[in-house]
């Protein structure tokens, strides 16, 4: 079984013991080049693998709805310091692993050409941020099946200054509780913004099928002419801006092998 619980769970759950860090990169890839890009991503992720890496795991989502990017990748570290140190280690591993392949001149030229194209796409067509796990926002990772693709909603919140406690109180009593009790949600997690372009809070809600996602949305529908309850009013009064996206979790790094794999 692919060890995806280790990939995601270590970031979102074991942060109870340490403040785990996620380095997040958003890639804007032309649609006609998307399949080749993700194949190259798998190849060069594998070629950058080594026992010396400080990377704890990683995952990739395909963008489905809202915003304007193709893929988003998550690399997980114990600290910002480990993140900063890992780049040179990855570069050294890439060189060592390519040398070990003992490629012919023609094969090496082809690989170099592919890498340069992959690297150019990343350099010119991405933006990034660093986030920190919030363990109090996690639910059900130990029982979720991380060997399968996930339909994922990402809710982004910018919180009004000084209203973080009220935000979390309202969120836990409302949305968090409702999702756990709905019968359609498989897992939930969240993170704080640390560096780069991003909102204060990200909330990830995972569904194991489009049917369950649709059923949850249907069950959550409400009468737009009816006033909110008191908890909802208090919660939304803390929010300065909010937006939602839909993603598809498609694969990650197996921490046992260090290799990238695609979900089924």
Task: Give the ranges of each region predicted by the language model.
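Bacterial Sec-dependent N-terminal signal peptides
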Residues: 1-20
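Short S/T/G/P-rich N-terminal loop/turn motif that feeds into the first structured element of a domain
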Residues: 18-227, 233-264
């Amino acid at each position: 079984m692919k060890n995806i619980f280790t990939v995601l769970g270590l970031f979102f759950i074991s942060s109870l013991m340490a403040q785990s860090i996620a380095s997040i990169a958003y890639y804007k890839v032309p649609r006609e080049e998307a399949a080749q890009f993700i194949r190259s991503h798998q190849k060069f992720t594998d070629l950058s693998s080594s026992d010396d890496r400080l990377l704890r795991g990683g995952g990739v989502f395909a963008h489905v709805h809202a915003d304007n990017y193709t893929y988003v990748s998550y690399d997980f570290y114990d600290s910002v310091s480990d993140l900063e140190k890992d780049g040179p280690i990855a570069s050294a591993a890439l060189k060592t692993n390519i040398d070990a392949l003992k490629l012919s001149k023609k094969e090496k030229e082809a690989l170099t050409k592919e890498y340069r194209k992959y690297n150019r796409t990343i350099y010119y067509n991405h933006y990034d941020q660093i986030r920190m796990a919030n363990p109090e926002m996690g639910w059900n990772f130990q029982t979720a099946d991380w060997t399968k693709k996930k339909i994922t909603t990402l809710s982004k919140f910018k919180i009004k200054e000084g209203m973080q406690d009220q935000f979390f109180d309202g969120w836990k009593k409302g949305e968090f509780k409702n999702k756990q009790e709905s019968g359609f949600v498989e897992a939930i997690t969240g993170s704080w913004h640390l560096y780069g372009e991003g909102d204060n809070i990200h909330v990830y809600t995972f569904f194991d099928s489009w049917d369950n996602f649709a059923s949850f949305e249907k069950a959550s529908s409400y009468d737009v002419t009816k006033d909110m309850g008191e908890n909802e009013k208090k919660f939304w009064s803390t929010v300065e801006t909010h937006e939602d996206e839909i993603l598809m979790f498609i694969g990650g790094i197996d921490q046992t092998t260090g290799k990238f794999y695609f979900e089924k």
